[in-house]
Amino acid sequence: MGNGMNKILPSLFIGNFKDARDVEQLHKNNITHILSIHDSARPMLEGMKYLCIPASDSPSQNLIQHFKDSIAFIHECRLKGEGCLVHCLAGVSRSVTLVVAYVMTVTDFGWEDALSAVRGARTCANPNMGFQKQLEDFGKHDVYQFRTWLKETYGENPFNDKDDAKQLLDKHKQQEAAESQSATSSGRQWSSHLTSLSSMSYSNYTTET
């Protein structure tokens, strides 16, 4: 079945194509809405509400045009107290881009912090460079209007999204620090190993006089 969807915010999940067909996982997470974005996106399960967006994982693919519909779909689902799964094929690039745009809209995060927060829950999250540029442009030109639109349309956000996203951001920073420390430690061990080998090699080729 699926490789395991990840909760980003309460009632909001990212997964891959297999997760979107994993009835057990969907039921466990109270998922009633599925946002499907990939080349051949279409409804697959009865009883689910779908938003299907045909889109390739190409840097030139325009995803900004889908941000508003995606954000509305996710937010309306969450306001109902139901779960929403956003998925593409791998749950790495396209789906992550839409969720990052949503996180930016319901918090005051810029695109880099929003992406880092998502990575705190889903370490494989990695939109292609074209999508990252679109998120950067969204943050510069559109996100403030989107925040106003969301509030005027749906009222005050009843969720603690900023606090929840901050926890994920902190988690990601801790993960990065741990990885950096591990890499530094490994580098020192390797350097020590090379020094030891060099010393052994030198002693093997020297003779007493």
UniProtKB/Swiss-Prot annotation:
Keywords: Cytoplasm, Hydrolase, Nucleus, Protein phosphatase. Its EC number is 3.1.3.16, 3.1.3.48. PROSITE patterns: TYR_PHOSPHATASE_2 (PS50056), TYR_PHOSPHATASE_DUAL (PS50054). Residues 4-144 form the Tyrosine-protein phosphatase domain. One of its GO terms (cellular component) is nucleus. It is found in: Cytoplasm; Nucleus. Residues 177-193 have a biased composition (Low complexity). SMART domains: DSPc (SM00195). It catalyses: O-phospho-L-tyrosyl-[protein] + H2O = L-tyrosyl-[protein] + phosphate; O-phospho-L-seryl-[protein] + H2O = L-seryl-[protein] + phosphate; O-phospho-L-threonyl-[protein] + H2O = L-threonyl-[protein] + phosphate. The active site is at residue 88. CDD domains: DUSP22. It comes from the Eukaryota. It holds the Pfam family DSPc. The keyword Isomerase does not apply. Residues 170-193 are annotated as: Disordered. GO terms for molecular function: protein serine/threonine phosphatase activity; protein tyrosine phosphatase activity. PANTHER family: DUAL SPECIFICITY PROTEIN PHOSPHATASE 22, DUAL SPECIFICITY PROTEIN PHOSPHATASE DDB_G0269404-RELATED. Belongs to the protein-tyrosine phosphatase family. Non-receptor class dual specificity subfamily. Activates the Jnk signaling pathway. Dephosphorylates and deactivates p38 and stress-activated protein kinase/c-Jun N-terminal kinase (SAPK/JNK). This is Dual specificity protein phosphatase 22. It comes from Xenopus tropicalis.
